[in-house]
């Protein structure tokens, strides 16, 4: 196919940290001798005790991943204390509220004071090194304070996205046996309140029935809305932090001590607790933040993600703050009060680096260019995308209309499991191709394998694996190392299997083609089909459900549900709406089904396996190439599904 290439821009060449020659040299060193390469770059963070061992990893057998394993450090020290002398009065966090008239700036000195106070509150209430703290918060500075306060005392945080339901929150509290929750009275999104404290109360009740008792709930006052109160359990954040000292010594943490758990969807029902550890993660998050975004002192950097996702962990909080950057936290949504909001914020705060998701770009593109044109955006120097592959049309619009053809676009590919960006352009080094994540970051060795596991060289399509470790890699699934091995290392022995399909072109550029397992990517957020299916089946009228993705013009993938009802029940629009509501309450708004097709039967093999390939084709309105249906127990169900499909071109 004919692909336009955009050479490195002159402006990027002139002020970049890395040119192509340096990229090629460093990359070669990083894969030929990772010990020496990372031994050097590990020094970018401060260590209380320097490491002598750099890399100790194996993808075979009882998979074990250790980096800098005898070093001692602390994440909050690296994100705050070490900057105070030179950058104490510099703005660490710019907070932009949901309401365009609400904003505030927090300096590194203020960040130190607040994080130390919150760390002392945690200690006062018995939280110790290794304890798990659940953070269920909107995008307010206190969410970042909570994360950093946990790292200061060595507690392990588990941030749960504020859009998740009480049931989803409870499941995550129970899985890591968390006994302390930090939340807020209400969140605000697009002008509407989100009942976080109420959801927390419900979740804590559900957890108690599963023998996990949350001892304390710390509540930040965001709206002043009325909330239920359990006097023995609930604490007001403002009262507690005012009553303690603004100094708290950082805990000396081993590089391999757990840092955080973040739950992500898998192809089987229960979300996995992805465990990241301290040293390697921070080295990798800070290094990728610096070089991928060409971050230089004085830049104003804005990643539009939520701290409930890994992008918020690595590229709103830890990466930028470790680099003494000014990071912008945005509470709102791209289209409130209208579709010009992002660009107004860019002008208001003179943002230089802007990192968002293709789904937001597609939706703003659909709103028209006028919303973009009424802002100047002259401060912008670099644009980035994250969360899913970006289609070339959206890339071109982002580059030409938003960036005025003067900002490189870094299309970054990575995962919750990888801790940081793995495949990406570097602004001063990489010629760009719309839709391609281009080349691997330092130390990352991609490999494409076919369905049988044979390595394919040169220009090829297949499944994307990574053949050696990098410091930001997850270490295990919390409490279930066997699941970690089975999920990521059993499909192709000795290789980390990403679950993504991939194409490599004749220039060695990588193009991510999307998930090859039963995981959906909806608006850049991963969602297991099994999770949605089990939510549907938990409704009393549903006997069976199968969920697949289909192309969606804004979200990338939409959620298409085939639902078989209990004997004697008949599907109608009222039931359709009830099922949509049911899924939202079980998982959260993110899992809202786009299409529900009532199906008397599902295409199954004689052994009872649902043929999802066929369901995908029908959902895509493409049933000319269904392939061999002779293995189905009842081939006639296919005709019925086609006749009643919901997604007609």
UniProtKB/Swiss-Prot annotation:
Pfam families: ACAS_N, AMP-binding, AMP-binding_C. It is an enzyme of class 6 (ligase). It comes from the Bacteria. The modification N6-acetyllysine is found at residue 609. CoA binds at residues 189-192, 311, 335, 523, 584. Its cofactor is Mg(2+). Keywords: Acetylation, ATP-binding, Ligase, Magnesium, Metal-binding, Nucleotide-binding. ATP binds at residues 387-389, 411-416, 500, 515, 526. The keyword Nucleotide-binding applies. One of its GO terms (molecular function) is metal ion binding. Mg(2+) binds at residues 537, 539, 542. Its EC number is 6.2.1.1. One of its GO terms (biological process) is acetyl-CoA biosynthetic process from acetate. It catalyses: acetate + ATP + CoA = acetyl-CoA + AMP + diphosphate. NCBIfam families: Ac_CoA_lig_AcsA, PRK00174.1. Catalyzes the conversion of acetate into acetyl-CoA (AcCoA), an essential intermediate at the junction of anabolic and catabolic pathways. AcsA undergoes a two-step reaction. In the first half reaction, AcsA combines acetate with ATP to form acetyl-adenylate (AcAMP) intermediate. In the second half reaction, it can then transfer the acetyl group from AcAMP to the sulfhydryl group of CoA, forming the product AcCoA. Belongs to the ATP-dependent AMP-binding enzyme family. This is Acetyl-coenzyme A synthetase. It comes from Sinorhizobium medicae (strain WSM419).
